[in-house]
Amino acid sequence: MKKFVSILLILTFIFTLTSTVSSAYGTKSVAEGSLTTSSEHTVNARSAFLMEAETGETLYSYNENERFSPASVTKVMTLLLIMEGLESGKIGADDNVTVSAYAASMGGSQVFLEEGESMSVTDLIKCTVIASANDAAVALAEHLYGSEKTFVTKMNKRASELGMENTFFENVTGLDDTTTNHLTSAKDIAIMSRELIKYDMIRKYSSLWQDSIRNGEFILTNTNRLVRYYDGCNGLKTGSTDKAGYCMSATAKRDGMQLIAVIMGAETRDVRNAEARSLLDYGFANYALYSLPERMLEEVPINYGSKGATAIYSAPFKAIIEKGKKENVNMIFEIPESIDAPIREKEQIGKVIYKLGDNVIGESSIYSLDNIEKASIGKLFASIIKSMFY
């Protein structure tokens, strides 16, 4: 029977900052409720949500599950499916798309595509990301799945896969003059935004203030003014209609921490921008992303193995911690005194539990570095004889 030793180390340390995503290495995200979020911070909007992107930790919420019309913030999901289509090879960035009459007929924000006009997927993405062009969004949707109707079915399927419990899409643009159930929530917008900003192309274009298409003849200006005026802002999407009010998913990164601030239903563009700035300011002022890299630990003895011990290492760890409290972080190592062979390389043999005060803020796995088979009977017998005489 394996005996586990819990070693409590109370450390005063500064975590090494890193932007490497650690979920693939066995790091468990911060436990819900382990952070103290402000009940005093208020927003002038129908709903709001603040998330840290790497851990998915909620830093602020207000009416976050209430369903409202998102206007052009809808295009976060539209663009996510396009990025996934590029990633899978279903479409190519250099594909030339012939604009349909339906795509060219889109009103609202647009780049005035004409029926029969040819434009590359990359340029259509730029138009959608930077200028929030409805005609470009529809052209992309038709290119990937043949029709907007089929594309919307895929949007709703993807929303379900992501756990967006309060979302239903009726089109790819967010135009809501004739929609009856095209709704989502601030939390769901943050969830799909978190997925979208994983893509380099999105981060590249959503952080630009201006770009151009048609050989420089048509200037694209970002609908997100925070890109120009807010330090660290790198996206993401704005939207407004009479029904939706003024909405935004604003992303910004400082000191290695990527925040997503969602505002829904503000009364004016200026109010929306101010509330998004205020929410981002709150996040950067009160929280920080700290991390520990992958690191080697002491060897663990192996019983009945072809090798007497295995080196072990702990996976990287990331957590959001309230500023000023890092000195209170404790680490509990749960490591077996010994392990019976066979064991496999990267086999989990223990874990590190991280605590801040009484709250568990996360844990990371401890793995074996070696692949050790069970020793043969002859080798075991030889080891016994050797131990008797030496």
Feature roles, as predicted:
Residues 164-168, 180-390:
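Domain-terminus/edge residues, biased toward the C-terminal soluble/receptor-binding domains
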Residues 1-2, 70, 121, 377, ...:
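Structural motif marking the loop-to-transmembrane transition
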Residues 15-16, 88, 291-294:
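Residues in and immediately flanking transmembrane alpha helices
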Residues 21-200:
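Active-site-adjacent loops and short helices of periplasmic peptidoglycan-processing enzymes
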Residues 3-4, 76, 254:
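Hydrophobic alpha-helical segments, especially transmembrane helices
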Residues 2-23:
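Sec-dependent N-terminal signal peptides of Gram-positive bacterial secreted proteins and lipoproteins
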Residues 9, 44, 345-348:
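Residue-level preference for short coil/turn positions at secondary-structure junctions
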